[in-house]
A protein has these predicted regions:
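STAS-typified acidic loop motif
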Residues: 1-27, 44
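Flexible, charged surface loops at secondary-structure boundaries
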Residues: 4-6, 31-35, 63-65
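Conserved beta-strand segments of the P-loop GTPase G domain that flank and frequently precede/overlap
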Residues: 12-14, 38-43, 72-73
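Short, glycine-/small-residue-enriched flexible loop/hinge segments at domain edges that mediate gating
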Residues: 23-53
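Charged helix-capping and loop-helix junction motifs
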Residues: 53-59
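Short aromatic-glycine-(Arg/Gly/Cys) micro-motifs in beta-strand/loop hairpins
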Residues: 60-82
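Short acidic-hydrophobic, aromatic-tinged amphipathic segments that line or gate anion-handling sites
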Residues: 87-95
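A charged, well-structured terminal subsegment
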Residues: 94-110
């Protein structure tokens, strides 16, 4: 796994790691990125068990409570297979667009 900064967005790439390793890695870097919008790119990995999604929901909710965006990218998910409390996109470009829209809404006080 790795992460990089793209403007005001941190993009975390989930490579071929084990899904349990993801949360260890993410928890280790989170204090460095807590003030940024976050995209987690899972690509085509099928790792979305209910317990994995529950952990993502907890992270997402906490991050959104800081008035920041948290989006996951997965090309294998669809809107019916993911809880509504998670912001999801099939592509990285769309995830960036979602964050841009979130920022506009925050700027307008919506």
């Amino acid at each position: 796994m790795n992460f990089y900064l793209d403007n005001n967005i941190v993009i975390v790439n989930f490579n071929n790691s084990l899904k349990d390793d993801f949360f260890i890695f993410f928890n280790n870097i989170y204090k460095e990125i807590t003030d940024k919008n976050i995209i987690i790119d899972f690509g085509e990995k099928n790792i979305f068990s209910s317990s994995f999604l529950d952990k993502l929901i907890n992270i997402s909710t906490s991050h959104q409570n800081l008035n920041l965006s948290f989006v996951i990218v997965s090309s294998i998910l669809n809107s019916e297979s993911i809880p509504q409390s998670l912001v999801w996109s099939p592509t990285l470009k769309e995830a960036k667009d979602l964050i841009e829209m979130d920022e506009m809404q925050r700027d307008l006080g919506l």
